[in-house]
A protein has these predicted regions:
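AAA+/P-loop NTPase substrate/partner-engagement loops
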Residues: 54-84, 92
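Hydrophobic anchor at the beta1->P-loop junction of P-loop NTPases
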Residues: 37
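Phosphate-binding P-loop
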Residues: 7-17, 23-32
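Structural recognition of the conserved hydrophobic beta-strand(s) that form the central parallel beta-sheet
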Residues: 64, 104-106, 133-138
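Conserved lysine of the Walker
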Residues: 45
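Walker A (P-loop) phosphate-binding loop of P-loop NTPases
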Residues: 42
């Protein structure tokens, strides 16, 4: 995969944008496959992600609201399931998504139901396996996603993967 971004000209070496830019360097792609930006409402999370998205030096990228991405993903999975020969539907969805975008930026990531959580775990594994970088904003830290949801224990592997693969 070609280098994801050019070095942003920043005065402070340790600033957030500097770290965001540095994660995209080729030598770090193997280790960090994304960034998860969380904080309170109106703190500038979306603005930081938009700055990164605007300055990243790749063409096959997508920025969307997380809710819209999940709606598109459920539609895609529904279409894939029509083909009985495909066994691992979320992985196949990840393959199709990765053919269109090597960088996915999600605004306002949240988990509202167990169906989304179960799909995301397998989908994100497939995306990361194919070299897709994920940048997401959220009002909650990963550990608080789907905090009081039904069968939350099934979401914990996804949260662990999110923490392992993303700079939080």
């Amino acid at each position: 995969m070609s280098e994801l971004s050019e070095e942003l000209s920043l005065k402070k070496e340790n600033s957030f944008l500097s770290r965001l830019s540095n994660f995209a360097r080729r030598e770090k792609i193997e280790k960090i496959r994304g960034v998860y930006i969380w904080g309170g409402v109106g703190r500038g999370k979306s603005m930081l992600m938009d700055l990164f998205f605007a300055n990243v030096n790749i063409h096959n990228k997508k920025r969307t609201h997380f809710h819209n991405f999940m709606a598109e993903t459920h539609d895609l999975i529904h279409d894939i399931r029509k083909n009985d020969k495909i066994k691992n539907v979320p992985d196949h969805a990840a393959k199709l998504i990765s053919q269109k975008a090597k960088l996915l930026c999600f605004d306002e990531m949240e988990l509202r139901d167990i169906a989304d959580a179960m799909v995301l775990n397998r989908l994100f594994k497939g995306l990361w396996k194919r070299g897709v970088t994920i940048v997401a904003t959220s009002n909650r830290p990963p550990e608080k996603l789907y905090e009081k949801g039904l069968h939350r224990e099934r979401v914990l592997p996804f949260i662990d993967d999110l923490n392992k693969n993303c700079e939080v």
